[in-house]
């Protein structure tokens, strides 16, 4: 009789065969000596379906015989107040002081002279 630990467990493939793509490494010419360098081109609507919409940042991990592409989540949009603060930081010291005084007036901490 077979021991329970030696029974093969069925498993599902990590990637559906329908999601597999076949590519061929081509080349791109490099100016000025026109040397050929290896190139892989990925394009198709399936990229967006897979989470790689136009403009998506991509993390690339390279190993021997394996390249892993990972879509990076979009950065959280900065709030309007933080954008304004970054603009104020670029101003001269005199203008920064004026902004601070204005905020004090709006907050009711200072009186207008």
UniProtKB/Swiss-Prot annotation:
Under Pfam families, the record lists:
SymE_toxin
Q: Which UniProt keywords apply?
A: Cytoplasm, DNA-binding, Endonuclease, Hydrolase, Nuclease, RNA-binding
Return the GO cellular component terms, semicolon-separated: cytoplasm
Task: List the signal peptide residues.
Answer: none
In which compartments does the protein localize?
A: Cytoplasm
At the top of the EC hierarchy, this enzyme's class is hydrolase
Its recorded name reads Endoribonuclease SymE
Organism of this sequence: Escherichia coli O7:K1 (strain IAI39 / ExPEC)
Gene, per the UniProt record: symE
